[in-house]
Design a protein with these regions (language model features):
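Outer-membrane beta-barrel translocator/channel fold
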Residues: 55-122, 129-130, 135-165
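A near-ubiquitous, low-amplitude feature marking generic local secondary-structure context
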Residues: 2, 25-28, 74, 123
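A generic structural micro-environment signature
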Residues: 7, 34-36, 138, 150
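A generic structural signal for short, solvent-exposed coil/turn residues
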Residues: 11, 20, 34, 46-48, ...
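Short glycine/proline- and aromatic-enriched beta-strand/turn motifs that initiate or cap beta-hairpins
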Residues: 19-64, 157, 163-167
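Cleavable N-terminal export/targeting peptides
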Residues: 1-23, 166-167
Length: 167
């Protein structure tokens, strides 16, 4: 019995431990942005050492306005006012760690279009992740986007989302 316990201890100390290093996730996030904006992001995230990550994302944005005829937000003034989309990349260095949670800065760039012009974007923000069983993560994100040639120069807001493991 003593030799079996010694063998188990030797195997346990000799093997390498990887705690979510080099893991990949698909994430979906939805949020509200100032002023009168909704944002949806679908992304693929590759996590490297120490919870640093690279994110490749597709983003859609809608800005609604009040209807000219009725003075309320109606389907036409919501869906057909201003829309844009973009594709980009973001680097997310980890700045805080704890048990089952970590926080990352989010620094990135994107390119896309509204219904008329090409848009370029610079993205800055903070993202906090909470790890759930089976590799799932919940996250909230404070984002600030600078959009070049867009209707909004600055977009800022909060996004809530979920990340699902790929492997």
């Amino acid at each position: 019995m003593k030799s079996i316990m010694m063998a188990v201890a030797l195997i346990a100390t000799a093997s390498t431990i990887k705690a979510q290093t080099n893991s990949d996730r698909i994430s979906v996030g939805v949020g509200a942005l100032y002023e009168r904006g909704l944002d949806m992001t679908i992304s693929y995230e590759h996590e490297t050492k120490y919870h640093n990550a690279w994110e490749y994302f597709a983003n859609g944005y809608i800005k609604w306005d009040e209807c000219q005829s009725c003075g309320h937000v109606c389907p036409d003034s919501f869906w057909r006012n201003y829309r844009s989309y973009g594709f980009g990349i973001a680097y997310k260095p980890c700045v805080s760690r704890g048990r089952n949670h970590h926080g990352n800065l989010r620094i990135g760039a994107s390119g896309g279009s509204d219904t008329k012009n090409f848009l370029g974007g610079a993205h800055f923000g903070y993202e906090h992740n909470y790890t759930l069983p089976r590799g799932w993560k919940l996250y909230w994100q404070v984002k600030s986007d600078i959009m070049i040639k867009g209707e909004d120069l600055f977009r800022t807001g909060v996004v809530l989302g979920v990340k699902l493991p790929v492997k």
